[in-house]
Each structure stands twice: as structure tokens, then as C-alpha cells.
């Protein structure tokens, strides 16, 4: 094909992708009595009566809420790179955030998260959850997973989630030895969940690493501002 200047033009073929709001679940041809249904799932050896994982965000998941989620049959994932592993009295920190106004928010959050992660508090939070008989799932970012995930497992964590906005099996960095999920799985020896991803290829490569679960989807949730400020957000469903 030639453009108006007589020069050859090349076009890249793109596929249509859909957000969750574009996809509907269509009822099938068979119905079943509610008392005969079973929504339970297993992650490794751990059974969840309801297939719900609560987000590993400081604004969502606290040790207390993780305990309640487990008691209700779901799973609450605690972020152990946030306020719960930086402060002994996290209730005071939450109160400061809640009572701040919009003009203070950015500076306050930068101040709060400037404090270092304390490995001894990782063990304290895990014990806090385990002492109530709850399943303990904890979350780390890929850059800290090799250092902190073994600490959490030694403290009694039942499941480990490695999560970033976008996570891939292959990653370019200045590090000579990057994060290898196959190796990490052998080290922690507990169910390993990884996310997030939003493409078939990335999902397949992560699953081939031997992980136990995959988190699919990259925004735009209630806490995501990409769509608001850029009018762009990753789509999470494709048709082939």
C-alpha cells in the first residue's frame, strides 16, 4: 500500500481487547440446586470455601481483616512491604492518613513509606494471623521477593504472592541474577502466586514457571488512576 506521497506504508495489525465491563456471563442450559453447588477451590493444600482473594493493599487488608477473611472461607493477602512491616503501631499511622486532607496526602504518604521495612515485624504480623488459626498469605514485590519471601516462610506464612502492576517471567535489569520464579518456588516450598498480567503470552510464560496461581488483570479498579488521567487502561480479555 502507498500513501499520498507514493511511499510504502506498513501497518501493524492489532487485536481487539476487552475490559471486564465488556464481558458478561451467560447462563447455561442446566440449573442446579444451591445446596448441591460447591464453590471451593484449593491453592496447594489450602482449601478456600469461597474463591475470593482480597487485595494486598494497605488500604484494604490488615492483619485483623486477613483473619476475618480466612474465617469466612476466603483469603486475605497482607502486603508486607507496607505500613504493617514498617510500624509497630499501625493503627496510629492509619489514623494519620484518614484524618489528613488532600493537600497533605502526598507528603504524608511519602513520609510514612520512607521508613524501612523491619524483618522482625514481618514475623510479628504472620504470628498475629496464625495465632487465630487463619491461613496466612503475604505479598511482596518482585524486587524484594528473594530477600523477604524466605523470611516470611520461616516465620510461618502459608502462601506467598509476588505482585507488581505488571509482572513477567522475563525481565531486563542491571542485576546479574534476576528473580527466577522456578528457583524461588524451590526455596520457599509453599504455594506461590504471581501477578499481574494482561496478555496470553505473559500468562503462559508465568504458568510454565511452575507457579501455583496467576493473578490476571491490570486495572482500572477503584484505586487505579490510569484511566482517569490518561484515558488509557490495559484490557484484560482477548478473543482469538
Regions found by a protein language model. Name each.
Residues 229-234:
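Conserved small/polar residues in nucleotide/adenosyl-binding loops
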Residues 128, 132, 142-188, 201:
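Hydrophobic, small-residue-rich alpha-helical packing segments that form membrane-like cores
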Residues 73-75, 155-159, 208-213:
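Glycine-enriched alpha-helix->loop->beta-strand junction motifs that scaffold or abut catalytic
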Residues 56-61, 139-144, 193-202:
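Glycine-rich beta-to-alpha transition loops that act as phosphate-gripper elements at the mouths
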Residues 66, 147, 199-212:
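Catalytic cores of alpha/beta
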Residues 1-129:
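N-terminal capping/small domains of soluble enzymes
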Residues 77-86, 161-168, 215-228:
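Glycine-rich phosphate-binding active-site loops on the catalytic face of alpha/beta enzymes
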Residues 51-52, 131-137, 185-195:
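Short beta-strand/loop segments at the ligand-binding rim of alpha/beta enzyme cores
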